[in-house]
Curated annotation (Swiss-Prot):
Site positions (Deprotonates C-terminal active site Cys): D98
Active-site residues annotated for this sequence: C104 (nucleophile), C107 (nucleophile)
Claim: Chloroplast is one of the keywords in the record: yes
Every Thioredoxin domain range: 67-179
Protein location: Plastid, Chloroplast stroma
UniProt name for this protein: Thioredoxin M1, chloroplastic
Annotated CDD domains: TRX_family
Function: Thiol-disulfide oxidoreductase involved in the redox regulation of enzymes of both reductive pentose phosphate pathway (Calvin-Benson cycle) and oxidative pentose phosphate pathway. Under reducing conditions, activates the glyceraldehyde-3-phosphate dehydrogenase and the phosphoribulokinase, and inhibits. the glucose-6-phosphate dehydrogenase. Activates NADP-malate dehydrogenase.
Signal peptide: none
One GO location term (cellular component): chloroplast envelope
Disulfide bonds: C104-C107
């Protein structure tokens, strides 16, 4: 088995010298071998946070995004596994619970609708958001399999469930059933 040494640098970032084991005799051109590959500096699979903060475009975009602190952005209080009983099941008013996750696109789509309804029905309904990533026990207990899922509770009992990104009219109709 003959070993050939490639001494010319290929157009992609590979070591300048590499040994290729081959059984046929003869030579080949590294330019011909790599000419079918696109010009590239390789893939970066990891990005450091420090490099992101140095990029002004990325840091500008990052400042306007609020995922984990969605309750701060929306004004709707958060409920979790530990506060579920006291805030939802023992509530005096009907309760509207939005089961969501920060990565969920449809959850982001209905968020402005839920905020608008929370303002409209303030004093008649209590509105809460439950992050299913941070509090997985409660969604499991109530059979939440997809998000967004909206549940309405009256006197601690689940009365209605709406699954998916639905219209404002659909949500308002469900709320009006329990006023």
């Amino acid at each position: 088995m003959a070993a050939y040494t490639c001494t010319s640098r290929p157009p992609i970032s590979i070591r300048s010298e590499m040994r290729i084991a081959s059984s046929p005799t003869g030579s080949f051109s590294t330019r011909q071998m790599f000419s079918v590959l696109p010009e590239s500096s390789g893939l970066r699979t990891r990005v450091s946070l420090s490099s992101l903060s140095k990029n002004s475009r990325v840091s500008r975009l990052r400042r306007g995004v609020i995922c984990e602190a969605q309750d701060t952005a929306t004004g709707i209080p958060v409920v979790n596994d530990s506060t579920w009983d006291s805030l939802v099941l023992k509530a005096d008013e009907p309760v509207f619970v939005d089961f969501w996750a920060p990565w969920c696109g449809p959850c982001k789509m209905i968020d402005p609708i839920v905020n608008e309804l929370a303002q409209k029905y303030a004093g008649q309904f209590k509105f809460y958001k439950l992050n299913t990533d941070e509090s997985p026990a409660t969604p499991g207990q109530y059979g939440v399999r997809s998000i967004p899922t909206i549940m309405i509770f009256v006197n601690g009992e689940k009365k209605d469930t709406i699954i998916g990104a639905v219209s404002k009219d659909t949500l308002a109709t469900s709320i009006n059933k329990f006023l």
